[in-house]
């Protein structure tokens, strides 16, 4: 059944050889775990013991082996695809992986520039802007809006010229959740 699934990935879904190999390794680990978990090697994918609890156990087993939550989540994704395939082919009555939730991954905060790094970036941008090229002036304005006004990249990308009020030095931007906000523009 695993061979059929891997052939399906390669031939029908046309996934790369590396991706198919990754799925194969993930399912080999699942097979190893289930043999250990069930206490014997003559189990079948259709056995009722191959259930949601067994798959949750697999995730815990992977975690105890030192794998990151992200890696465990990826292996769960491969497992879900495999069981979805088996269910779609009517080889199992229900998909036990469908009800297994992926582990929450830690959200890393974006890095930031030190004050000195920011100063260096602006100094370089100002030097380039003095060369009177349109691109250099544009880049300086972009930096000023991002850093000085606290715009997000998505807000800057969606910004229209008519959203800038030069008289009051304010910019109207569409923020997260399509909420409009007004931010000040610095002197530069």
Language-model features, listed with the residues they occupy:
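Conserved catalytic core of the tyrosine transesterase superfamily
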Residues: 1-188
């Amino acid at each position: 059944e695993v061979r059929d699934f891997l052939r399906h990935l390669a031939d029908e879904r046309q996934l790369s050889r590396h991706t198919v190999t990754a799925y194969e390794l993930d399912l080999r680990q699942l097979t190893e775990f289930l043999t250990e978990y069930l206490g014997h090697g003559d189990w079948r994918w259709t056995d009722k013991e191959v259930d949601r609890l067994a798959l949750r156990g697999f995730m815990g087993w992977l975690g105890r082996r030192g794998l990151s939550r992200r890696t465990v989540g990826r292996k769960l994704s491969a497992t879900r695809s495999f069981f979805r395939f088996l269910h779609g082919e009517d080889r199992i009555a229900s998909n036990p992986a469908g009800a297994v939730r992926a582990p929450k991954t830690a959200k890393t905060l974006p890095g930031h520039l030190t004050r000195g790094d920011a100063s260096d970036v602006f100094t370089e941008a100002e030097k380039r802007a003095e060369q009177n090229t349109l691109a250099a002036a544009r880049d300086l304005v972009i930096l000023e809006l991002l850093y000085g006004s606290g715009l997000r990249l998505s807000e800057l990308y969606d910004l229209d010229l008519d959203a800038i009020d030069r008289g009051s030095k304010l910019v109207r931007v569409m923020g997260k959740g399509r909420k409009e906000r007004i931010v000040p523009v610095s002197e530069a």
